[in-house]
UniProtKB/Swiss-Prot annotation:
A single cellular component GO annotation: mitochondrial intermembrane space
Domain of life per record: Eukaryota
Domain remarks in the Swiss-Prot or TrEMBL record: The C-terminal domain binds 2 Fe-S clusters but is otherwise mostly in an intrinsically disordered conformation.
Gene symbol of the encoding locus: dre2
Subunit structure: Monomer. Interacts with tah18. Interacts with mia40.
InterPro entries: Anamorsin, CIAPIN1, Dre2_N
Region described as Linker: spans on this chain: 153-197
Protein name per Swiss-Prot or TrEMBL: Fe-S cluster assembly protein dre2
Transmembrane feature ranges: none
Amino acid sequence: MTPVPVSVDTTADFAAPPTKTAPSTSTRTLLLAPPSIAAHEEKLRDIFATFDRASTDLQMLDRLSAGFVSLPAATYDLVLVLTDTDSARRAEALQLLSRDVYSALVPSMKGGAKLQLQDGTWNSAEGLEAILAGLVEKDGAFEKPAYQEAAVPLRLGGKKKKAPAPTEQPPVATGVGFVDGNDELIDEDDLLSDDDLKRPMQQPANCQPEKAKKRRRPCKDCTCGLAAEMEAEDKARQEKADKDLNVLKLQSTDLSDEVDFTVQGKTSSCNSCSLGDAFRCSSCPYIGLPPFKPGEEVKILNNMVQL
């Protein structure tokens, strides 16, 4: 007999009907409720009758303010603060919308998402924290700006700037503005004759010193001769004073002189040195010294006795 081929049925004996999945929506809503609304179940029932529970989240403002709840980033298209239609809970809700709440709320909003109140629009004073958080007021609500990212090309190593071309200088005439150090200088005294040099110098009236007043000081760049004249007077006065101070000083030639009062027959003009007593004459160079011993050699150096 010829073998008969056998086929295996691989189909399932029981096929369940395909389940219908609800179409996913990209719009999500966040409801922020004050703590007092939890005691009114009918309020929550009415709210969820308006919003789809599958795409709506409910959070309590007090828990969000305390940091017990963390919101997903860039998720919600609408944030609605439940204040009741008659504004019964407006003050309670706005009091809980602190800076910490906005710090957690704004990052969870998508670009272009809105923040609204259930009972109406915001007042100017109520939206200060929202503005500080980066939201923009629009049509009685606050909207998060939709920032777009764009790549900006950065050019590195740009072209080097060309050096400016040198400007042409106008031609300068020869011999103008130049000083030649090899030129011979003329002595001004050669231009004066002997009579001009013997003629007394005439001082200007401004430089002549007044007799009744103090001596006039010469100018810093004096050219009338007053400075040289006063310098000569000061030099002569200094030389005279130095000469008066050197009256009592011995010259270097006097160092070789020796005085010996121990030689027999030598006496002073006052005849007191031979008495064997101390020198007491006021003009004696040995005043105050004890009498010399026989044979002692004495020298005078710069008016000082050298024994």
